[in-house]
Amino acid sequence: MLSSVRPSVRPSACPSAPPARRRRGTAPAAVLAATALLFTSACTVANSDTGGAVGAAGGNTLRIVLDQEPPTLEPCESSLASTGVVVRSNVTEPLIERDPTSGELRPLLATAWRQTTPTTWSFDTRPGVTFQNGRKFTAKDAAFSIDRAVNSDLSCNVDGYVFDDSGVEVRATSATRLTVTTAKPDPILPLRLSFIEIVPRTTSTEAKVREPVGTGPYAIGNWQTGVSITLDRNDTYWGKAPAFARARYVWRSEPSVRAAMITKGEADLATALDPKDATEGNSVAYPNNETTALRLDGREAPLDDIRVREAIDMVIDRQAISDTLFGELGEPAAQLVPKGVVGFNDDLTPTTPDSEAARALVKAAAADGVPVDRRITLVARNGQFPRVAETAEALQYQMAQLGLNVKILMTDTAAHLQYQLRPLPENVGPIALLIMHGNQAGDAAFTASQYLLSKSPQSTFGTRELDRRVAAATALAGEQRQKAFAEVFAYQNEAVAQYVHLAHMRGLLGLSSSVRYEPNSATGDELRLAAVTPAEEKGR
């Protein structure tokens, strides 16, 4: 999903991180350690309209504190992590859901599906389901929701992110059956449809909605802008009723504040904690499928020279960054997707730092007239992940070892998206953008279509050969698909080098002793409230 943009792609018990291999005596590691110490700080819990607590402590309200207020609750934007964490599978539901642990597709509002021709799929919808406004759910609503998200002029995040510009043809053939036809064979269409939340066919197609109606276990009760969002249990829900009668979200930008709210009993769940604020008693780690990377704008000198891009890749000490700043929440990466995603390449390994060879590449580029002294702006987002500012400073320091002139620009989410998504800003010079990509869908096609193509929404450039390889891999299935996408990631590293991969990440969820919940790789994008129970209901 957007972790920032899910453009993440979204959508278990968390395995322990492998032991970190610390490097002693390296200049980057020493600087990282010093930087980390400089940025530690103490915070107190901010006041709220309930005296600091998220809701009625000890009552039947589940209290959640987020790292930011959702920009919208529009269902067709639910692949944005900040929206999906509230809406997805809570207020609205898709036809099909992907099990975040096994990767299997499971029936939700669709009970069965089948491919009837190379380009057509048929879906049977679940009978006896009603929307929160009392309207009966039928296949017409499902067809409408797909058409609204993919074929309308709403510019939904799912359109172009999950589906390409060719659109789909969708038709309800009865009250309980619909067909979806694509322009070309699509072996993962059911997976793509798991990103589309179903809404009533009375929903506006002219404008995005602020407070949607869905079929989920909770309905929106109240959104007090800047203060809180309250969800009320949907007593007509077709599935198992959730344990809590209501849920209340507030948001605090400082991770130390969110952690303190758990410790002080003011919240039950808290997203995106910082390792320095986490303890065994207030948090749990989980694999979140996120990968941090530096995207280099290959349109602007000196980053338009592959030697400079390769030099940056070679000088970055990923192990030092992971050990010193990420702790057990980061593992050095060599590609944009983690293990478990279709297309992950087992043969790729993180680049071993080689400052001498990297400096030689920059020197050769300079000798050929490349303006290697031109200022590069390293753009990162406040709150993007724990210790993001220190990470940006570490990258700046290491790039400076090459003689590159790097300036850091820390932004808010809105400004960061302007650098991340097309149309890209003009007249801003060469940009090195710190990104965090999460492939929750479990298939490399979602990553490649967003980040690797020449015209991808989140790429700055590409090559015809890489475009060709991605197109060929997308049409395949099974082992052929796995092999082809693994080769795509290898080719990106060897011949394009748009990305300097940093680390595969883990998340930290604040969890109070009053509730029971097992986070999984989708938790940061769709925190399913129905999976949370009071402590006395289930042993931890």
Where are the predicted features?
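Periplasmic binding protein-like
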Residues: I64, L269, Y397-S456, K483-A486, ...
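N-terminal lobe/hinge region of extracytoplasmic solute-binding protein
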Residues: V65-T117, V213-G214
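Aromatic- and charge-enriched surface segment that lines or borders ligand/interaction sites
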Residues: T111-S155, P302
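Extracytoplasmic/peripheral linker and loop segments enriched in polar/acidic and small residues
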Residues: R114, K407-M410, A414-A415, F446-S513, ...
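Surface-exposed binding/hinge segments that line
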Residues: V158-T202, N222
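Gly/Pro-rich hinge or "lid" segments in bacterial periplasmic/extracellular proteins
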Residues: D186, L191-P242, R246
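Ligand-site clamp/hinge motif
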Residues: E206, D235-T279
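Append "and occasionally in soluble cytosolic enzymes with long acidic Gly/Pro-rich linkers
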Residues: D304-Y397, E536-R540
